[in-house]
From Swiss-Prot:
The modification Phosphoserine is found at S249, S253. Belongs to the TMEM176 family. It is a multi-pass membrane protein. Keywords: Differentiation, Membrane, Nucleus, Phosphoprotein, Transmembrane, Transmembrane helix. Its main location: nucleus. One of its GO terms (biological process) is negative regulation of dendritic cell differentiation. It is found in: Nucleus membrane. Expressed in spleen by a variety of myeloid cells including macrophages and dendritic cells (at protein level). Ubiquitously expressed with higher expression in lymphoid tissues. It comes from the Eukaryota. The keyword Transmembrane applies. The chain crosses the membrane at residues 61-81, 89-109, 125-145, 197-217. This is Transmembrane protein 176B. Pfam families: CD20.
């Protein structure tokens, strides 16, 4: 503060002159890297659940889904060695098994990472797995009905009729022999065994498809329940934080009393 001396009626009076106040304003600009890192942190926080833990039940269902998909693909290879049916022509054993493997991998990745985006993708894959498994089940049931029909049995058994010699040859007559009958019966016996084997493959494939539907629905139910529980927990945390912030509001400033100045 600057001082000045003034003489009033022979008396020196010292007065002070107020100096001008200087206000220094410093504006800090964040760099582009800091802004990018902050945006990535906000995105990661938005796409992830807070304090998420691994559900081992869901993880085991994902591993089971992968195994069922692998078994489905192996059965698809085995079915191609049998008679040509609609089940083989459609290739449903391969595409339904591939979708099941992808759904299982999606479940495992989601449980290990606990992200919102991975959760949505895994649920979409589970829906696709259920749809493809249902379509494969319908084809498997149709193939079972056809393989157990009488027309299919006669069609397969007719391939052994070529082993029987003709009744009249061009130059001489040929009679049936016990050897030709034995070969025909042996051929039909082998064909019957092969028919039963591929029928067992078809039954096993249909059961695998039904299990894929059950596992997919169970995984989808657990995923939806976990998502609803996490969302409700986030809402409760936000409400608690709002209550705490509302309770910590600053108290009202006290009223200033006017002090009378005596002359």
């Amino acid at each position: 503060m600057a001082q000045a001396t003034v003489t009033v009626d022979g008396v020196k009076v010292t007065s002070t002159r107020p100096q001008s106040a200087q206000i220094s304003i410093h504006i800090h600009h964040k760099s582009a890297l800091e802004q990018l890192l902050g945006a990535m942190g906000s995105l990661k926080k938005f796409l992830s659940y807070p304090q998420a833990r691994i559900h081992y039940g869901q993880l085991s269902l994902g591993v089971t889904q992968i195994l069922l998909g692998l078994v489905s693909c192996v059965l698809g290879v085995c079915l191609y060695f049998g008679p040509w049916t609609e089940l083989c022509a459609s290739g449903c054993a391969f595409w339904s098994g591939s979708v099941a493997i992808l759904a299982g991998v999606g479940i495992v990745i989601h449980e290990m990472g606990q992200g919102k985006l991975s959760g949505h993708i895994s649920r979409l894959l589970l829906l696709a797995c259920s749809a493809t498994a249902a379509a494969a089940t319908v084809m498997g049931v149709k193939s079972l009905i056809w393989q157990t029909s009488a027309s299919y049995y006669f069609e397969i058994s007719s391939t052994c009729d070529s082993l029987q010699p003709s009744i009249v040859d061009r130059f001489r007559s040929v009679r049936f022999t016990d050897d030709s009958d034995w070969r025909t019966e042996r051929c039909r016996e082998y064909l019957r065994m092969m028919m039963n084997l591929f029928l067992a493959f078809c039954i096993l494939f249909t059961v695998i498809c039904i299990l894929k539907i059950v596992v997919s629905v169970a995984s989808l139910g657990l995923s939806l329940r976990s998502m609803c529980g996490r969302n409700s927990q986030v809402l409760n945390d936000e409400e608690t934080e709002k209550k705490l912030l509302g309770g910590d509001s600053a108290p009202a400033s006290p009223t200033k009393e006017k002090i009378p100045v005596t002359p």
